[in-house]
Amino acid sequence: MKKIFLLNYAPPSSSIYKYSQRIYECTSEYSEQINLRYSNRSNKWEQTVQGRIFESPVKNVLSANILFSSVFFRNARKYILNSSGKDRVVHYTHQTLSPFKFDLERSVVSIHDNPYTGLKYGVYTSDRQNTIDKMMFRLYSRSIKHNLARYMKFKYVITTSDYVKNSLIKYGFRNEITTIYPPVGNQFVPIEGKEKIREELKLPRDKRLLLSVSTDQPRKNLKLLEQLMKRLDKSFQLVRVGKPILNSINFSNVDQQTINKIYNACDVLVMPSFEEGFGSPVAEALTVGLPVACSDIEIFHELCGKYAFYFDPNSVEDFERSVTTAVENLDLYKDKMIERSSNFSHLTFCSNINNYYDQKFFM
């Protein structure tokens, strides 16, 4: 019997949970979502999560996931064994999950990040010069290296971009690696009437709105964005989905319809990141036809091709040039961007992931 177990560890608000959920939406006839919960800080697990929840008695993520996962989550492994046959497939939806002991040829992992930058202090984690932080990061990085070594024994690996795929090959992976781009949510669609949307969202109608959607991790390079906003004149206004920057207009915990309206209300998406494994905001901007001013890094070229305004992420002068050029050419790439966004549609993703499972495991 065709059966796939999707193992997730992330809370419902996270991009990793959404990735797991999107796979489930495409494969619900023969898949089941297994959620390994280390903590309930968001207090939303039971209300919003799909699938079964298996809870660790220990709330320390490092201990629960890395050091003793086979002990703390033995009920999850037992459930999978008892509710399926040998033809089961176990899909770990993120590389930080510590794998259980299942058939390596019927297991697959999705790896979302370049292992080199993911293991570098101050890229995905705080760059504070703090001894305790550094000690914890050393423990964390050792555990991730241990996980990666175990995943290198798998027959199959999925990556979210060719950039990550190439980094894994360089790292030493000799598995059968396949790139399947994550999908953009169905809520992202172009909307006419920018002024009306701005009025509804209480955004200024007489400003050039620059949109920034990100966490505040060091790799997001928000210091450069702050420098940019200090240089630009008052005709520009920053709109942030995330923590505030200077006098930005801020949104948080917005619903699906509102986030789409925010994209459609703004003039340019700004992405000064040093490092991304994929870069969902860029794919979302392409989908609605919002011009993108982004770092001149490999992953953004993979997503946007020639239909973006690139800049050196170490130069605020180049960032300013890129943004002003984008503002002066708002419709230059719009049609080509929307056309290119089909690579990241939910329909394309569903077709790719179902074909992948069939070809690798159920032929």
Give the label of every model feature segment:
Residues F5-P99:
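Active-site donor-binding segments of glycosyltransferases and PAPS-dependent sulfotransferases
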Residues I132-V157:
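Membrane-proximal helix-turn-helix segments that form the acceptor-binding/catalytic region
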Residues N175, P183-E200:
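Acidic anion/phosphate-binding donor-loop and adjacent secondary structure
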Residues P204-K220, E226-M229:
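Conserved donor-binding/catalytic core segment of Leloir-type glycosyltransferases
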Residues K261-C266:
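Short alpha-helical donor nucleotide-sugar binding micro-motif in glycosyltransferases
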Residues F274, L286:
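Aromatic "clamp/platform" in nucleotide-sugar-dependent glycosyltransferases that forms part
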Residues T287, P291-C294:
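Short hydrophobic beta-strand element within catalytic cores of glycosyltransferases
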Residues F309-V316, V323-L330:
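Conserved acidic donor-binding segment of nucleotide-sugar-dependent glycosyltransferases
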